[in-house]
Amino acid sequence: MKKIIFLLWGTVLMSLTSFAQQAGGITHSGLPTHQPPFPVVSYQELPNPVSVDASKWKGAKGINLSWGSTDVRYKKEEPAPLSRVQQVIDLKAWRGERVAAQWVVWTDQPLQELKAEVGGLKLKGKKAEIDRSHILSGFVRYVMTDELNPDGRGGCGHRPDASQFDSTLVADPIDHLTPSLELPAHSTQGGWVRVWVPADAEPGVYTAEVAVKNGAKELGRLTLRIHVDSRQLPAPKDWAFHLDLWQNPFAIARYYGVKPWSQEHFEKMRPYMEMYRDAGGKVITASVIHKPWNGQTYDPFETMVTWMKKADGTWFFDYTIFDRWVEFMMEVGITKEITCYSMVPWRLSFQYYDQATNSLQEIKTKPGDKEFEEIWTAMLTSFAAHLKEKGWFGITHISMDERPLDAMKETIRVIRKADPDFKISLAGALHEELSDDLDDYCVALRMKYSQEVKSKRKREGKVTTYYTSCEEPFPNTFTFCPPAECEWLGWYAARENLDGYLRWAYNSWVIEPLLDSRFYTWAAGDTYLIYPGGRTSLRFERMIQGIQAYEKVNMLKSEYVKRNQKGKLKKLEKALELFDEGKLPQESAADCIKKVKQRLGF
């Protein structure tokens, strides 16, 4: 049986090998990278398509250093637009919270070895400190991006010709692996400092120094102060926020050139899935058919379940890979939910191994067809028995996305026939008549659940969330979006009393994700939030900050209700009303968040 299972990966492995043999990389946009493909530790950014405007540097002489803003993607070719140099920055944090600051250097002369050294944070007047193990420091590197569609209404649609879109280098990857960078004259470089305050930290003001150097020569020092409150955030595993970012294990196998589902593959995946866990990730993404989304990503989702039609016409299903994937993710710490895609794939085509002909075959069938009901009743009956044996049945969802109402109704009927207790999830359009059948319901930002539906689902313990995709121009998570829009997402969930947020792609990397985030379908960055080498990003970091805000808001709500502090509760709810997507981008997400934080004392 193992021979049959791994036969299905032959095509994948051949494509991995061909890429590994390339002498130099090439991006989705056809740009040569002039370096080995698929870099992990060190790499060179692509040339900047925007030339330096000397007039903008007239007032920026010498080497300049300052704290900047985490709301800004500083342009590589322009001096930082700061009205004054800021040498000290003050941040507020609860115990257990992550907070971050961005420093920035802009220089009219070359720097051969720019680096930053961050010391531990010491508590004023006491011996307590937050040591370096709680601090992430890295350069904010540059990646190629593009823009919204010409009509400004979103980022959906094929983009076969990159020249039709304005392409620039943009700050996004946070590179904690590169110890130093060489900067040419007339360039700007940001650096990130993130502190994860220990849950048992003593409240008070903690101070650290950031020394920025060019080789051995110190360019300057910046002071970071964190005001730690006595309140405490729970650990991410205990966050209420339901974060569902679809993981793509196949992208990691391709990028690292390892055999899918080998021990090495799991070792390469671990850092990325730990990052997802530490962001509060709750859901394991499983593909139970071949290409449930018709290969829309560069690295298509292959099936984790082997489908075999035996010579006698009966069906056999092998769950070896599915089990290994789920067990691995649970070992990492993702244990709340398993979503299995999809009974209604985009092509309505199902691949299986045919024992009689010793070949791979396809069945094309749709909900409502007799054949559809027969094959899925067989599969789901087998699957339910297997899940019950493993102890996973209660957390496993049969999942669909963006499917028509009639197809959903028929699919639900087939699921209930196979096992009436199966849980079902949908990420798609709002159909309130489906709500009772959906244990996990996620609709697009523009669609609004009625208060009645939200309240009923809350009472029944069902998950109710929302998503953004390529359709929303604002807010979104493209690499050219203002970083604060990623934080806005968590705040909005708090305003709407939703359980969380879904984004369809955590790590569906393009060919060279560290260098060029553009894709031949959709706006740049739509397919991934994190980078090779276990690198985080401005987008991912700000998303986590929004999730933390959600947790803090809900903790305060519970406290105010318990203590009957109606005035404080009303003030909080009034502040949350500012999170209205209709006001973006005229009022920026950054300004909105700043106003609300000031009102709430965050």
Feature-to-residue mapping (PLM):
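Substrate-binding cleft of secreted/luminal carbohydrate-active enzymes
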Residues: 482-528
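Mature N-terminal, pre-catalytic/accessory segment of carbohydrate-active enzymes
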Residues: 18-294, 392-393, 586-602
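Short, glycine/acidic-rich beta->alpha junctions
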Residues: 95, 267-268, 317-321, 406-407, ...
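Aromatic-lined carbohydrate-binding surfaces of glycoside hydrolases
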Residues: 165-166, 174-175, 187, 196, ...
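Active-site clefts of carbohydrate-active enzymes
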Residues: 458-488
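Catalytic domains of carbohydrate-active enzymes that cleave complex glycans
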Residues: 349-352, 360, 364-372, 376-430, ...
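Aromatic- and acid-rich polysaccharide-binding/catalytic face
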Residues: 422-448, 467
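Bacterial Sec-dependent N-terminal signal peptides
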Residues: 1-25
